């Protein structure tokens, strides 16, 4: 049995993860970490420093500002940390990269199987289409999401950029009077209602448009992905920065 400590256990995703964990025979949430605790089937600690029990994997699905406290705990325990939060700064990402040299860390901007398959497809199709097609990314989320563009949109955009040999640049939204440049990758964010998460990658050519689309129907898809990452990381002891590609066996 893999024992999980869930940071952000009382948030929207934390509640869904707690519910979905009961479907995994080899996983158990033994404790949670949350500043605003409510009654659960497991004990809740307000900060990582307060945690006083043993665990196998630390799962974070909260906010980016929790990162340093979680890394400090991981440095003490040497247990794997699964990072599912988004909205990290470049400094945060550099810190994760640095700590992964000595700690087993996992990070993904999106925990769904579908998004990660699309990301894998982009590595293959982008070099074939770029040059004859303009590339734009549109992401849609609920009106409570604080980071923009979404971590997933950034993930997809980075994959596209890394797949192109030429110099490209990101353009976030469009306004005013200016013609689109050939080397642009457009990224657009929409916030409204209760949209769980929609992502469209558009390759617009002359006479045709190719789209890769993903629509999350419920948060359960992210919860299951996070728990599968815990299954995988529960078997890992070597330092490194692991991703969903490792979990689902995608080779780059």
From Swiss-Prot:
* Residues given in the record as NAD(+) binding sites: 8-13, 84-86, 108-111
Residues given in the record as (S)-2,3,4,5-tetrahydrodipicolinate binding sites: 142, 151-152
Write out the similarity annotation: Belongs to the DapB family.
The keyword Flavoprotein is assigned to this record: no
Subcellular location field: Cytoplasm
Q: Reaction catalysed?
A: (S)-2,3,4,5-tetrahydrodipicolinate + NAD(+) + H2O = (2S,4S)-4-hydroxy-2,3,4,5-tetrahydrodipicolinate + NADH + H(+); (S)-2,3,4,5-tetrahydrodipicolinate + NADP(+) + H2O = (2S,4S)-4-hydroxy-2,3,4,5-tetrahydrodipicolinate + NADPH + H(+)
Looking up Pfam families in the UniProt record yields: DapB_C, DapB_N
The EC number(s) given in the record are 1.17.1.8
- GO cellular component terms, A-Z: cytosol
Where do the catalytic residues lie?
141, 145
Q: In which pathway does it act?
A: Amino-acid biosynthesis; L-lysine biosynthesis via DAP pathway; (S)-tetrahydrodipicolinate from L-aspartate: step 4/4
> PROSITE patterns in the record, alphabetically?
DAPB
Q: Which CDD domains match?
A: DHDPR_N
> From the UniProt record, which GO molecular function terms apply?
4-hydroxy-tetrahydrodipicolinate reductase; NAD binding; NADP binding; oxidoreductase activity, acting on CH or CH2 groups, NAD or NADP as acceptor
What is the recorded function of this protein according to its Swiss-Prot or TrEMBL entry?
A: Catalyzes the conversion of 4-hydroxy-tetrahydrodipicolinate (HTPA) to tetrahydrodipicolinate.
Descriptive protein name: 4-hydroxy-tetrahydrodipicolinate reductase
Q: Which gene encodes it?
A: dapB
The GO biological-process annotations, alphabetized, read as: diaminopimelate biosynthetic process; lysine biosynthetic process via diaminopimelate
**Keywords tagged on the record:** Amino-acid biosynthesis, Cytoplasm, Diaminopimelate biosynthesis, Lysine biosynthesis, NAD, NADP, Oxidoreductase
């Amino acid at each position: 049995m893999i024992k999980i400590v869930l940071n952000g256990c009382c948030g929207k995703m934390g509640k869904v993860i707690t519910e979905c964990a009961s479907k995994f025979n080899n996983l158990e949430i033994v404790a949670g970490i949350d500043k605003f605790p409510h009654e659960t089937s497991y004990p809740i600690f307000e900060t990582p420093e307060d945690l006083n029990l043993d665990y196998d994997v630390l799962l974070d699905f909260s906010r980016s500002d929790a990162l340093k406290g979680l890394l400090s705990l991981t440095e003490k325990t040497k247990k794997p940390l699964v990072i599912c939060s988004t909205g990290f700064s470049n400094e945060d990402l550099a810190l994760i990269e640095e700590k992964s040299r000595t700690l087993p860390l996992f990070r993904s901007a999106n925990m769904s199987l579908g998004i990660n398959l699309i990301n894998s497809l982009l590595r293959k199709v982008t070099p074939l289409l770029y040059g004859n097609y303009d590339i734009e990314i549109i992401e849609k989320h609920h009106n409570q999401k604080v980071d923009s563009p979404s971590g997933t949109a950034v993930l997809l955009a980075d994959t596209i950029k890394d797949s192109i040999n030429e110099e490209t640049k990101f353009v976030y939204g469009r306004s005013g009077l200016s013609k689109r440049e050939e080397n642009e990758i457009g990224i657009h964010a929409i916030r409204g209602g209760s949209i769980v998460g929609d992502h469209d990658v558009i390759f617009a050519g002359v006479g045709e448009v190719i789209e890769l689309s993903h629509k999350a129907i419920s948060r359960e898809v992210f919860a299951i992905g996070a728990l599968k990452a815990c299954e995988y990381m529960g078997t890992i002891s070597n330092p490194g920065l692991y991703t969903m590609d490792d979990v689902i066996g995608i080779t780059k």
